[in-house]
Amino acid sequence: MGDREDFLDWFNTTWRAAEVALHNGDAGPRFATWSEREPVTLFGAWLNAADPVAAREVFEKLAADFSRATASEVRLVAADVSGDLAYTVHREITSTSVRGEPRDYTLRVTQIYRREAGSWKVAHRHADSEPEAADTA
């Protein structure tokens, strides 16, 4: 496999499993997919962070709020790899419980990844809510 195929294999297995775990209340796998080396930035749909420690705190807060994920779909729009950097543009369609209340939402996401010691790590994430169809006309 080439770099892009190797990266997409990681994205579709390790990274996706970490997202499902987070939406079931377990931030541990997400910690493992994120860089602990500066710079790290998170412009989340609900919370933001500007360094690895703050990002970890955000993930702990999210995991405390999430439970009982019933659906998790990722629709990849674009992805590429150049050396030790990669990016994805995708939509995350999620059904989970937030503070005990069922919730469905779609996020538009752009992520940048760094290869660190041979492993891919998220270094930047920007996510926002998908506008309603009427808002996009």
Where are these regions (language model features)?
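Residue-level recognition of conserved beta-strand positions in structured domain cores
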Residues: 44, 90-91, 124
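Hydrophobic/aromatic beta-strand elements that line small-molecule binding cavities or substrate pockets
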Residues: 59, 73-79, 91-94, 107-114, ...
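A solvent-exposed, acidic/Ser-Thr-rich amphipathic alpha-helical stretch
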Residues: 4-9, 13, 21, 27-83, ...
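Short beta-strand edge/turn micro-motifs at domain boundaries
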Residues: 104-136
